[in-house]
Amino acid sequence: MGTKPREERTRPKQKTPTFLLELPLVVEPGQAARLRAHLEAGRQFYNAVLSSGQRRLRQMRADPAWQAARAIPRTHPQERRAAFSALRERYGFSEYAFHDLAKELRVSWLADHLDAVLAQTLATRAYRALNRICVGKARRVRFKSRGRGLSSLENKRNDTGLRFVLDTPAQGHRGWLIWHDDQLPALIDWDDPVVKHGLAHPVKYARLVRRPASSARAQGADREGERYVVQLALAGAPLQKPKHAVGSDTVGLDLGPASIAIVPRQAEARLEPLCAELRPDGRAIRRLQRRMERQRRAANPEHYDEKGRPRKRGKGAPRWKQSQGYQATRRRKAARERRLAAHRKSLHGQLVHQIVAVGHTIITEKLTYIGWQKRYGRSVGLRAPGMLIAHMRRTVASTGGTLREVPTRSTKLSQFCHGCGEVVPKPLSQRWHQCPCGIGPVQRDLYSAFLAAYLDPAADLTPSCAQYVVPWEGAEARLRAAHERVKERAKEGQVLPRSMGIPRARARLPQSRSEATQELLFLSRRGKVEAWKRRPEPPVLVPRESSEPLERSPDEQH
């Protein structure tokens, strides 16, 4: 009795919709010290699991059977999958094998800080990091250093260990995060409709998150300058605010490192710079970085030689000391970067809601943002187009829409011309599409977004001439109007990315508003032509007895 049938035990879990709700926590000084100890234990445990898993991965890849499995052609997927699965099972490289490893490593003092379920979640996190290396999506893993620390811990369920408990209205309607012997009260604003909607849904599990504050004197921060929040994974769909409407059109997007083209089938087209409101103060950040370097050198002179060069570190080398001034400067720099990231996230949310308000079906090309990071590192690091697509994917899924990312190799939207059907590669410097068949000139990004808007995701994704003949008659005027609006913004002085195909507004202005410099005067002296060093002056009219004025030369004036 009590044994479930094999079919029922191996049935996969049903995936239900999940959304997050974040609540700040009120943490006392003693509780904060215990939380730091728990997170430090989690850091060391995660590093131990990661180190053991990395050893298993090296042994598995050194086995000759690994090379034999790689030699199996991809046209035989079942044989290839079976060979790799046998290797993973032999060397214990799977998520459940890592859970068994976590059971072995969770001994001594670690068991006082981490229960079995939390240890399994950390083991799963380590396995996913190593599995990215195994499948070729990453090159190395990062161990959690003492300086970085572990910023979050989560549970698998909400009935034991780290859990969130909500009191009934008769008991005060308060929320508590319970972990070991600590009960951390959560700040709940019941007047907020988002919070009220979220707490009406069942809690799947809770996640404790530690975030740095601007200083120890910041509101809600402990003496180490850190805040604690709880993230609740709730079953259901998030609240849709009335101000965030959902349209019914189909929208085509063309995303670039610094710009985005939005072309719906019915509404007006747009060509916008991505996160144009972001204004990072690079000069202030560089000054903070130089100050941190000076403070680091002053506190650690033994780590530098007589010429100021860092010494090579070996085993047993002394640790780097961090002065209080260095930590304060680091917090100031982190606060600047945190505010910039929050502003970027807010701008992403505004743009996503504007797009979703036009249409619930969005079509764009599937891009490789890692390649953009290599070529346009500064622009991608500032505007984060990959985070924009991830934000859009979550928002569209929560509103019941569809985000379709079409492959670039089959569609070739930036090279295709719907007038003649020719596919002509263009260099990146060519920002206009103009074909001898009569299509164009039209801005390249707008034209690619137009082609994406009229793709049929349910059918063949290869664009054809027939499907664009009728839409082009009404879309050409909308694309030209969108580009004219961009030109007006450039004339007003806004600096726009060069990828929009418009010269920078500063290039149209003269370098100086003063009068043009006059040409040098040349004099003939002793048979040689010499430049006159004095600045030429206008002729002076001297009245004479006669009615005709007499011009005086500059030499005569002096």
Regions found by a protein language model. Give the residues of each.
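Catalytic micro-motifs at enzyme active sites that drive phosphoryl/nucleotidyl and oxygen chemistry
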Residues: R9-K13, P212-G220, A235-P242
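Generic detection of short hydrophobic beta-strand segments and adjacent strand-loop junctions
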Residues: F19-L25, L184-K196, E272-A276
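Stable alpha-helical structural segments in soluble proteins, enriched in small hydrophobic residues
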Residues: V49, T121-A129, I133, L446-D456
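Nucleic-acid-interacting cores, centered on viral/eukaryotic replication and modification enzymes
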Residues: T16-L20, V27-P29, W109-H113, A126, ...
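Short coil/turn segments at secondary-structure boundaries
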Residues: S51, A62, K137-R146, E302-G308, ...
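Gly/serine-rich nucleotide phosphate-binding loop at the start of the catalytic core
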Residues: G2-L118, Q557
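Positively charged, helix-rich recognition surfaces that bind polyanionic ligands
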Residues: E226-H558
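Acidic carboxylate diad motif detector
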Residues: A71-A221, L382
